[in-house]
Design a protein with these regions (language model features):
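Active-site-proximal C-terminal subdomain of hydrolase catalytic domains
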Residues: 31-32, 36-143
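Catalytic-core segments of thiol-dependent peptidases
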Residues: 1-44, 51-54
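A short, solvent-exposed loop/turn motif at the edges and junctions
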Residues: 145-146, 184, 206-224
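Short, solvent-exposed loop/linker segments at the N-terminal edge
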Residues: 153-158
């Protein structure tokens, strides 16, 4: 491969426009030479084309891209990064892109311990692998679950609000991030407790309405 894309199987920058994946926007993981070389004369490189693909109303491409920015990577090292990264995600619950990629790179410490000198594999691959996109993005490893959000009537006297967060099966969801927003401003934020409950007090003197959002790994964002 190179900055223009993959050669076997063939998938190049010009092919991105033919994608029709719509809202199913994945993370592209490309353990192929130079496919993430965002400073290359090929502009856009494959990674940039994937991230830029589509429009807000007709999306295509992906939400993030992981790959090397150097042309001279080797399969034996790329495969270690690949294997350790997927092991971290599938077997150890490390689903954020940044930590998962770092886990992949750390595999070279174990598999190639002698490659520790300046410019050798451990240093080289720690520099050339990078993420285009949000490194805190969490990857779905299975069909994501969905929230149900139950809200008790808010008390006008003290702004007391109690929210119950469950999943589709009715199970309580602990440690979900709950954000309450009014006119794009966050007016309260916190985590559900072990019983999936979030309790807060709001200053509702100047609030006509508000939105509640819930987020957690392996869930589609909830909104009410």
């Amino acid at each position: 491969g190179d900055a223009n894309g993959w050669h076997y199987p063939e998938f190049h920058v010009d092919d991105v426009n033919d994608l029709n994946n719509g809202w199913l926007t994945p993370v592209f993981m490309s353990y192929v030479c130079n496919s993430n070389d965002f400073a290359n004369n090929v502009d856009p490189c494959l990674a940039e084309a994937i991230i830029r693909g589509g429009t807000p109303t007709v999306p295509k491409g992906g939400v993030a891209f992981i790959g090397p920015s150097d042309l001279h990577t080797s399969t034996k090292y790329n495969n270690v990064i690949n294997a350790y990264m997927y092991d971290a995600m599938l077997n150890h619950g490390i689903v954020e892109l940044g930590p998962a990629m770092q886990a992949g790179q750390s595999g070279l410490l174990k598999e190639f311990p002698a490659q520790s000198g300046p410019g050798e594999a451990q240093e080289f691959y720690s520099h050339v692998y990078n993420i285009l996109g949000d490194p805190s993005l969490q990857v779905y490893l299975d069909t994501p679950n969905e929230f149900t959000i139950d809200v008790q009537n808010i008390s006008k006297s003290d702004g007391f609000l109690e929210i119950q967060i469950n999943d589709q099966q009715g199970n309580m969801v602990p440690y979900a991030v709950v954000s309450i927003m009014s006119n794009s401003d966050i007016i309260s934020k916190g985590l559900t407790d072990e019983q999936g409950k979030f309790v807060t007090s709001l200053d509702i003197s100047s609030v006509e309405n508000f939105d509640i959002y819930a987020n957690k790994s392996a869930f589609i964002q909830g909104h009410k």
